[in-house]
Amino acid sequence: MAPPHPRDPSTAANYEQVTVSHYALKWKVDFEKKHIAGDVSITLDVKQDTERIVLDTRDLSVQSVALNLNGEPKKAGFTLEDNQALGQKLVITTESLKSGDRPVLEIKYESSNNAAALQFLTAEQTTDRVAPYLFSQCQAINARSIVPCMDTPSVKSTYEAEVCVPIGLTCLMSAIGQGSTPSECGKRTIFSFKQPVSIPSYLLAIVVGHLERKEISERCAVWAEPSQAEASFYEFAETEKILKVAEDVAGPYVWGRYDLVVLPATFPFGGMENPCLTFITPTLLAGDRSLVNVIAHEISHSWTGNLVTNFSWEHFWLNEGFTVFLERKIHGKMYGELERQFESESGYEEALVRTVNDVFGPDHEYTKLVQNLGNADPDDAFSSVPYEKGSALLFTIEQALGDNSRFEQFLRDYIQKYAYKTVSTEEWKEYLYDSFTDKKVILDNIDWNLWLHKAGLPPKPKYDSTPMQACKDLAAKWTTEGSEAPTDGEVFAKMSNSQKLAVLDAVRVNKTMFGDRMPALTATYKLDQAKNAELKFSWLMLGLETKWSPIVDASLAFALAVGRMKYCKPIYRSLFGWSATRDRAISQFKANIPNMHPITVKAIQSLLK
């Protein structure tokens, strides 16, 4: 029997005594003050007798707290106590609450004008330069900066919301829209939402902006600023097709709608799996649908992450490792098993190896699958490790068991068993053993301690390396001493985007043998003209790593234009580490801080410590 979940270290909430079943939000979005003001009614379930309720906050101004136990709200005393990197604890003293009580907390408050979850953009900072824009990013522990809450994945709740925004703007949330009405003053619009499926706090999300909607199917649409609407519709036209394949792999889709919204370039991630409304970076708008693998990833989160959720951020791999594995299962069904094998090997070699060896170092705590976060902000540990090391473990297990269809059925059963719940690594492992009692000897041969609790690289799974070898062979023509570099770019041009990336990665791995061939590589493969952001990023990184001075201006411009941390953090790391570019890069970064997302600012500032 798996042990009870240990306490989530990233929250101060007393969720062992009291839990939240529902949030009812009434918000007013103020673009001038750059904050959200309003109130929240929090329905509680008391599990153990208590005389206090503890919620997470960060930089909130709390005006009043009332507790409604028997239909009559009574003013409650409260204090805000510092909780270091985790914000402030809102400690509410109550009359004696008994197990089984269902009181409602009523809190009036407002966010600060630098809430960690929010980015307010002026009209000039948006793509169309027509109207201001707001979007949120609550993962991992930033929901507490826009609502007092139990900000832990261990607590799942439904929510409803009424959001008042300036007239002419559209509001979207991670919920099902219930329509809109004009405000009494006629200058604002009130949008209503309901999320009937219980979700963790990090999946609370809001967007407000000048947006246009394009229908993809009965349950899928894409939202974007009008100038990007057609391009977004073209890029993501296969969303319904991907969703249907995902249902074949993982089971029924329970969220009603699957909409996408293309955010401004400052959005710090590739995508964010907010229920009913996936947030997407505009860097995916390649014009040829070559980066829609991110959509398969975010769709997969509808089962692993959103439906079955890691109980704490120390077990983040249960969200992301499973989701990467499902994403590649979907691609295997759509494009063939060889493509799944290739993507899996690419993830191991291009992302995991580099993160472990070059970013953290092989002995670092954050290269473990199950991590000890202590009082650290979980964002500090964010990397490709839970994604790729987690996926590699599942690939290894599937391979060892030798029955892909049975392992796929296990995944569906696992999702069904833990749907609407949270799960620990020990619970998952116990369920794995219970599902394969006839394969215990095989499972026992897996070095669980090495995979789950040891730092560094795990053993590389046995992939079919046929497509990868073709990429390495082409790269070797650029990096083998005495070889003649290719002058014909046709072979490269005919490759898929993921194969092109593998070629450049293989060159980067062997860059010491690359010599002064950067100008020739750039010209032969027309890399300076790349519209695909992944390809352009790999080219820029190769140029920086080989200290090719003509790449500097393009690298600085890319880091300035793109807020996605996957790109700008490594670019700034390289620029900061090169004496010839350090001062210029620091100057650009500091000057651009007002235009950047706070999550991105914090991540890049950490490189300067």
From Swiss-Prot:
Location in the cell: Cytoplasm
Which CDD domains does the annotation name? M1_LTA4H
Pfam families attached to this UniProt entry: Leuk-A4-hydro_C, Peptidase_M1, Peptidase_M1_N
Q: Where does substrate bind?
A: 137-139, 268-273, 564-566
* TM ranges: none
Cofactor binding note: Binds 1 zinc ion per subunit.
Any one GO MF term held by the record is: epoxide hydrolase activity
Annotated residues for binding of Zn(2+) = 297, 301, 320
Q: Which residues form the active site?
A: 298 (proton acceptor), 387 (proton donor)
Q: Which UniProt keywords apply?
A: Aminopeptidase, Cytoplasm, Hydrolase, Metal-binding, Metalloprotease, Protease, Zinc
Which GO CC terms are listed, alphabetically? cytosol
Record EC number: 3.4.11.6
Task: Tell me if Ligase is a UniProt keyword of this record.
Answer: no
Q: What more is known? A: Despite its similarity to leukotriene hydrolases, AP-1 does not have leukotriene hydrolase activity. One of the mammalian leukotriene binding sites, 'Tyr-378', is replaced by a Phe residue in AP-1.
Which PANTHER family does the UniProt record give?
LEUKOTRIENE A-4 HYDROLASE (PTHR45726:SF3)
Q: Name the chain's protein.
A: Aminopeptidase ltah-1.1
